């Protein structure tokens, strides 16, 4: 066999081979014998089918198996010559040429190797970090909100008129063209006025009503209403108000602290203020990281951490980005790409820079996660998806199964690891005073052993 291998750089190699047609044909009998042991053909006992008949009936399968066997032998010899093992590979080799000539085949393939990444410039990549420390005014604002959130609703006198932040219990029924419509009726329905639980015009119509009062009012559903059969329609609603409850004001003192910090043995207002300050600090930190610093850190990692990237993985990422882009394209654009191979190739090529950066950052994050022992457990992935489902009104089990079927769980896990690694690097660069605040709020760091 004529075999040539070339190591292009630390992450890429290429092979060129010319195995003979005779070499392929020598494999036919062995493969045909294996098939003959398994197949059953009328008139013959299992294992006694003539090879000539097997070769005729299963010619395509034999040819395919023989070619695959030959390619694997070519790769095995190439790996040996390169001095590499399967553990050194990243992804599968990409067969770029397989052509049959008169007496031989021409085979070419690109081989991706795990890159060598040196992390000695990480500190240079991390931008300076300074999170805003909450002042007394911000702390007091949050305390007032907590006092409101934890306040109980109590009954009001019969003369009270409904106002924003009151809790109402109502019956209602809606009609379109004098006929009730699906989803337009409820009894003993509760809502808090001003929370935008219902359409704004619906809640406005309830303002000023008194307990036991009944009211009719027109309402036009917005043109973009989520229930398409109601969008833009004019309706008439009949409402009966049963009960008005108002929040019982809570004072900002030790008693409030005991309610909010129910699991604390000695909760005081002083402790509550410390917790509020810490929580506001975490919120400020998350906002700064997500809106500014994480992207800046990624740009620095891309620019300053230099190493060879496996071409095969970049090509795979380009394919993925191209396929994902197709889903958001207009039908005429997709049709244009289908009709022109040149346009499709050009469109795919437009994703090269993004694909290269994505692959590079993934390798860097993976290396950092291993070095710092930062990981994400599978149950954390499921918790994240469960939360996503609850926030979007989806069935959690169905969403998780959808991710599993589409092989997307690994991508979610990697995204979570990336987020955790970036936050870890930025946290290390916080001023000492702010690191102390962070430690008080996070006694159990998010850094976990992968597994």
From Swiss-Prot:
One of its GO terms (biological process) is chaperone-mediated protein folding. GO terms for molecular function: peptidyl-prolyl cis-trans isomerase activity; protein folding chaperone; ribosome binding. It is found in: Cytoplasm. Residues 165-250 form the PPIase FKBP-type domain. It catalyses: [protein]-peptidylproline (omega=180) = [protein]-peptidylproline (omega=0). The keyword Cell division applies. Its EC number is 5.2.1.8. It comes from the Bacteria. The keyword tRNA processing does not apply. It is an enzyme of class 5 (isomerase). Its main location: cytoplasm. GO terms for cellular component: cytoplasm. Keywords: Cell cycle, Cell division, Chaperone, Cytoplasm, Isomerase, Rotamase. PANTHER family: TRIGGER FACTOR CHAPERONE AND PEPTIDYL-PROLYL CIS/TRANS ISOMERASE (PTHR30560), TRIGGER FACTOR-LIKE PROTEIN TIG, CHLOROPLASTIC (PTHR30560:SF3). HAMAP family: Trigger_factor_Tig (MF_00303). Involved in protein export. Acts as a chaperone by maintaining the newly synthesized protein in an open conformation. Functions as a peptidyl-prolyl cis-trans isomerase. Belongs to the FKBP-type PPIase family. Tig subfamily. Consists of 3 domains; the N-terminus binds the ribosome, the middle domain has PPIase activity, while the C-terminus has intrinsic chaperone activity on its own. This is Trigger factor. It comes from Helicobacter pylori (strain G27).
